Curated annotation (Swiss-Prot):
Its EC number is 2.1.3.3. This is Ornithine carbamoyltransferase. The gene is argF. Keywords: Amino-acid biosynthesis, Arginine biosynthesis, Cytoplasm, Transferase. It catalyses: carbamoyl phosphate + L-ornithine = L-citrulline + phosphate + H(+).
Length: 302
């Protein structure tokens, strides 16, 4: 794997990367494959977890991170992505980019000669999902016979999680209102891959039905960056899809709750559930560091 834009790029390497993440977290793996390497971090969208975890992780692996806001680059003044890619490939050893459009990252990959890692696009968020899988593995031991329910908007996180669940053999249900389903092509691909791992992928509009026998409940904000003009309508439509104690009680007794953050407490999840004993949210957030270090390690150790 040279680049990571989609979970599909890591289809055959998911478990290997998770093993590296566990080893880095425990301290068993101490090698620093980024020594004397410079990693550019381009941000077209604001970030807390992605920026801090990558910056710290690059340092811990021996490298030097360079924060590059899109407004500080000539991209902001109309320089073609092709030209930017060719030039940055001469200066840097790798790029992590948090972009507004997935197509822009694909173009960056096309003209770069160095590894490109997506820190989020409007289509997928693979780095987040590696942290999620690491968290589920830590809490549940393995993925077989486990059921995760993603509740809310079928967004970029949901898209990547569908593919990941199919690859590792975990059952996944997306509980969402009609019209807010995940990407159709990704959903179809995930269902095809799930057949190979004897897992099930499905969409359920009835959230109460969806959470039955769930091992993991997962949610994200109802209004993503760029959807602010739909805020009132989305809040009305998604209101029945809130993770609260009542909904949580319908899942397994030992079910855990996950959220990729930032959260709007009182909307997609209640404050008491976020800090409850069943919340894995803070371990999940910490695991962004270990998962992203593992991705970098895997790419640059090859």
């Amino acid at each position: 794997m040279k680049n990571l834009l989609s979970m599909s790029d890591a289809k055959n390497e998911v478990n290997a990367i998770l093993e590296i993440a566990s080893g880095l977290k425990s301290g068993e793996i101490t090698e620093k494959p980024l020594t004397n390497k410079y990693i550019g971090m381009i941000f077209e969208k604001s970030s807390t977890r992605t920026r801090v975890s990558f910056e710290v992780g690059i340092h811990q692996l021996g490298g030097t991170p360079l924060y590059l806001s899109s407004k500080d680059l000539q991209l902001n003044r109309g320089e073609p992505i092709e030209d930017t890619a060719r030039v940055l490939s001469r200066f840097l050893d790798g790029i992590m980019i948090r972009a507004k459009k997935h197509e822009n990252v694909e173009e960056l990959v096309q003209y770069s000669t160095i590894p490109i890692i997506s820190g989020l696009t409007d289509k997928e968020h693979p780095c987040q999902i590696f942290a999620d899988l690491l968290t589920i593995k830590e809490y549940k031991g393995d993925f077989n016979d486990k059921k995760i329910v993603f509740i809310g908007d079928g967004n970029n996180v949901c898209n990547s999680l569908l593919l990941a669940a199919a690859y590792v053999g975990m059952d996944m249900t997306v509980a969402c209102p009609e019209g807010y389903e995940p990407n159709e092509k990704i959903y179809t691909l995930a269902k095809q891959e799930a057949q190979k791992t004897n897992s099930t992928i499905k969409i359920e509009n009835n959230v109460n039905e969806a959470v039955k026998d769930a091992d993991v409940l997962y949610t994200d904000v109802w209004v993503s960056m760029g959807d602010e003009d739909e805020q009132d309508e989305r809040e009305r439509i998604f209101k029945p899809y809130q993770i609260n104690n009542e909904l949580l009680s319908q899942a397994k007794d030992d079910a855990i709750v996950m959220h990729c953050l930032p959260a709007i407490r009182g909307q997609e999840i209640t404050a008491d559930v976020m800090v409850s004993p069943q919340s894995a949210i803070w371990d999940q957030a910490e695991n962004r560091l270990h998962a992203q270090k593992a991705i970098l390690y895997h790419i640059f150790k090859e």
